Amino acid sequence: MGINSVKLVSFSGIDGAGKSTQIEAFCGHLRASGLRVSLFTFWDDVVALARFREHASLKAFKGDKGVGSPDKPIVRRDKNVRSWYLTAFRSLLYLLDAFSLCRVISRSADSGVDFIVFDRYIYDELANLNLQNRLIRFYVRLLLMFIPKPDLAFLLDADPEAATLRKPEYPLEFVRQNREAYLRLSRLVSMTLVPPLPVADATEFVRNALAQDLMKAQLDLRLQYPWPAGPAQSADGENVSTRC
């Protein structure tokens, strides 16, 4: 697989949508093709003041810490807690995250990799906001002007009931609302929607989307830098030298 520049790819979706599985398959496919990949987890590698935010959230909202599983469900209280002052505070934090994201991408792009892959992106934070509010949509559009747009931004759609069973952390009603927010955001930022599919089919869908994007990139490059024409020929077919 050939590539002409660094590609930025992100995976987003509700908790339990199967992002980790698809990211592992995607990165494995790229590495098997001889490409160099940098993988970043948004919360661990990008988010500003991550420890402070987690500690403050646990102390203020009294939710559980960790990752939920079918045999060990938990009750998280963080992004599902909403109020006007929390929205204002989150908007400020997301601005800091945007600056951090630009710095992380810039450093990675200079490291010689072919692909930069994100397990969640700033899109996942923006989906926590009330996108039905006109002022918030204006804020989102403004913020999006300053962050790198992924070449491929995958949104893994999932049935809320099935996702909640796989990863029981939030109330089902919130998961439904969160899914709707993602779908609304996907129309705002032109994400590639991966429909709810069996794992193997979703993996194939992602690979096909990648192949189409690479083909389009190569076509765009050829249109921008067309191959030089061969030597001019005379009427009898002999080559004619050309001079400038």
Where are the language model's segments positioned?
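Conserved lysine of the Walker
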Residues: K19
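ATP-dependent small-molecule kinase phosphotransfer cores
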Residues: D44-L131, F138
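P-loop (Walker A) phosphate-binding loop of NTP-binding proteins
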Residues: I14
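Hydrophobic positions on the alpha1 helix immediately C-terminal to the Walker A/P-loop
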Residues: Q22
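Post-Walker A helix-loop "phosphate-sensing" segment adjacent to the P-loop in P-loop NTPases
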Residues: G28-L39
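NTP-dependent small-molecule kinase module
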Residues: L165-C244
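A glycine- and Lys/Arg-enriched "phosphate-lid" helix/loop adjacent to the NTP-binding pocket
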Residues: F115, R120-R184
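Hydrophobic anchor at the beta1->P-loop junction of P-loop NTPases
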Residues: F11
